[in-house]
Amino acid sequence: MAPARLFALLLLFVGGVAESIRETEVIDPQDLLEGRYFSGALPDDEDVVGPGQESDDFELSGSGDLDDLEDSIIGPEVIHPLVPLDNHIPERAGSGSQVPTEPKKLEENEVIPKRISPIEESEDVSNKVSMSSTVQGSNIFERTEVLAALIVGGIVGILFAVFLILLLMYRMKKKDEGSYDLGKKPIYKKAPTNEFYA
C-alpha cells in the first residue's frame, strides 16, 4: 500500500509543478490589447540588441552583463497593413454577371432534366422534380452502385465464412493431436486435509 501512496503523492506533486510552470508562461492580456505583439512578433532573444548592432559586437562574459543593455531595448516596429481589414467587397460598375429579365433569354437559360418531358407553360414547375425514389418502372438492381455493393458484400461474407470454418477445423485438429489431453496424471498431488480435534 505504501508504493501506491507514494505514487499518488508523486502525481500530485508533478501536477502542482506543471500548473506553476503553466502560470509563468501566460502572456499578459494588457500587452495584447495595447497592440505590442502581433501574431509571430513576440520578443525573441535576438531582439535584445539594438538596430544596426550585432550580438557579436558586445563582449559579454556573464549573466549580469546584460543589465546595462535593458535601457536601450527598442520594441518591435508596428507595421500597418496596406490592405484594409474589413470584409467590404466593392461593387463592379461594368457589365458583370447580370440576371436576365427578358423572357427569351430566360427560356434559353433553362436546364431541362433527363427523363422528364419538356415543361409546358400551363403545368406547375414545382411538381417536375426527378427523384430516384419516385421513378416508376426501374429495378433497384439496374443501378451500378447497388450492384457493386452487393458483389463486394457477398465476397466479404464468403471470405468470413471460409475463415470461420478454417478456424474451427484447426481447433478440432489440435484437440485430436492431444494437446488438450486432460487424462494425464498431475505432477503435484494435493496433500490430504484431515483435521484433528483435540
From Swiss-Prot:
Glycans are attached at S39, S61, S63, S95. The keyword Transmembrane helix applies. The chain crosses the membrane at residues 146-170. GO terms for biological process: cell migration. Keywords: Glycoprotein, Heparan sulfate, Membrane, Proteoglycan, Secreted, Signal, Transmembrane, Transmembrane helix. Homodimer. Interacts with CDCP1 and SDCBP. Interacts (via its cytoplasmic domain) with GIPC (via its PDZ domain). Interacts (via its cytoplasmic domain) with NUDT16L1. Interacts with DNM2; this interaction is markedly enhanced at focal ahesion site upon induction of focal adhesions and stress-fiber formation. Belongs to the syndecan proteoglycan family. This is Syndecan-4. It comes from Pongo abelii (Sumatran orangutan).
